[in-house]
Amino acid sequence: MEWKHFLVEIRDQVARITINRPPVNTLSRDALIELGSILDQLEKDPSVRSLILTGAGEKTFSAGADVSEFGGMGDREQAEGFLKQIHDLFDRIENFPKPVIASINGKALGGGNELQMACHLAIAADHAEFGLPEVRLGIMPGYGGTQRLPRLIGQRRALEIMLEGKRISAQEALEIGLVNKVVPAERLAEEAFEWAKQLAEGPPVAMKGIIQSVINGSRKELPEGLKVERENMLAVMRTEDAIEGVAAFFSKRKPSFKGK
């Protein structure tokens, strides 16, 4: 199926979603709604085991919200509904049952940075830049940045970035834990795909359990988080993949996981 704002390619159990809104891949309301529909399809598709989210071109992952739409936000109730819709979408990405890798090919600013923070893992080109510059427009991050950035890098560093509206380099993003890997720009697409392919070969049920335990558990007190882990572990232990994994270990062969 063809999409208006995104390109979707599936290969070797990996779905590559490309934000295709030149020149800077802004996230319009229509684009965000479309992204939700894409996630609907990919979640149901058993041939897809991991996802890559990236931007078209070589300069920008996403510059964030389409500021031209702000004037048509309407009253408080309408604006609150719009923000809630975005929060729900980004929460869905964060809780997606299959690994989601942000492949950051350039600038990730504002909502674009908040989008990549909602992904499970992130790999960036060495020329990429990150920022939440909303304060310079007299507003503030509203797509989850005030909540996810402190959880990823710590409160004081997050406040510094948001209060100053500063940009940071890919190398600094790596050093503070905002991304997992930084690679030369010309190798980004290949490295992201190989990483996603490696994850796609893993046990789907166990990976879903890990994601749920980490994301949901981190929002709870430790005893409740451990309860989430316990419930997921008990479910995973009963799968065919668990039996296969143990058998492969003792047979000294590579396991073949089926997601059952």
Region locations from a protein language model:
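Terminal low-complexity tails and localization/encapsulation signals of metabolic enzymes
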Residues: M1-W3, A247-K260
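Conserved CoA-thioester-binding segment of acyl-CoA-metabolizing enzymes
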Residues: M1-T54, D91
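CoA-thioester-processing core
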Residues: L89, I93-N95, S103, L109-L163, ...
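Well-ordered beta-strand positions
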Residues: L121, E160, E164-K166, E172, ...
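Glycine- (often His-adjacent) and acidic-residue-rich active-site loop
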Residues: G55-F90, A108, G138, E221
